[in-house]
Amino acid sequence: MVEDQYPFKFKWKEAGLVNTPVNNNMKQGKLRYSEAFYSVQGEGKFVGVPSVFLRTFGCNFRCMNFGLDRGEKMRDEKQKEGIIHNQEVQGLLDKNIHKTTNRFEDLPIIHTGCDTYASIYPEFKHFNMLRTIDEVVEHLISLLPEGKWTMDNGQDVHLIMTGGEPLLAWQRLYIDLFEHPKMKDLKNVTFETNTTQMLHNNFKDYLTNQDRFEVTWSCSPKLSVSGEPWETAIKPQVALDYADVDGSDMYLKFVVADRVDIDEAGRAVAEYRKAGIECPVYLMPLGGRSEEYNLNVQEVANICMERGWRFTPRLHISLFGNAWGT
């Protein structure tokens, strides 16, 4: 079984990946993803860089408390087949939105919990695509302005592996993805990860030995504001595993709403530093909606200046609002 061969406890059945079944998907070289789109990177080190985003399906977290007032927790949670749903997601399910909506991009945007809920909850699995690596690559290439990763003017388009959590078992397919003939001019890959998933040995060896593209780990450990427990969210040994990939770059990025979150981020950074992780630290304001984001942005920027940490905006929120495909 796939889950027995990985050092994490992702609940495949709850994520809707067993009934696919994921084992057969892997054998057939098929990747399930919710969307692929071309935009500018809105967060972190490469803000403003033209990028193609590949959002894989499935996550080991739910982050149900994002967007709630401090001290408030998701109430009246309903359980269905062992799955705890965010209240807003449950409301959509009660209204049969997942059955009456025809297109992924027409699904409503929610304001609490994970804003990419359609990439993690199994009821929305049918909105996601299950494609061979050849088909995935064709989709990605079709999004590029010149049909190639390095443009005629010498500028390159980055590939962002995001989710969900892109470093679940799908990582087994990434060698074939990156070695595809139409990916040979790819120069930069960023993994946007919650930093809880160890790398598969073969994939780690591949990343260490290849010298064709730069690898960046955008590590965004979840704080208590997300609703995820510290002991499952803060994993310095996983960050060390990523840092062990020769030539790769890394930064920590924390989503924060106020000084309480920022103090907690400081404690988390101390844990990573103690483990030997020395990398830049970014703070990003919480806020999937422009109104919420604008309330937090100046305070977070001021605190970054106080503490010497780096500030990252959510550029895509300012440019496009919180919408699928941005």
Name each model feature, range by range:
Residues V137, I141-H158, P166-T326:
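Conserved AdoMet/S-adenosylmethionine-binding subsite of the radical SAM
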Residues E35-F37, Q41-S51:
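S-adenosyl-L-methionine
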Residues R32-E35, V52-R55, M161:
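Short, hydrophobic/glycine-enriched beta-strand segments
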Residues D4-N19, N24-K27, L31, N65-F213:
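Conserved Radical SAM active-site core
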Residues G29, P50-V52, I110, V215, ...:
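A generic secondary-structure signal marking the coil-to-beta-strand transition
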Residues V47-V52, T56-F61:
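Conserved N-terminal beta1-alpha1 strand-loop-helix module at the mouth
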Residues G44-V47, C63-L68, W324:
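Short, glycine/acidic-enriched capping/hinge loops at junctions between secondary-structure elements
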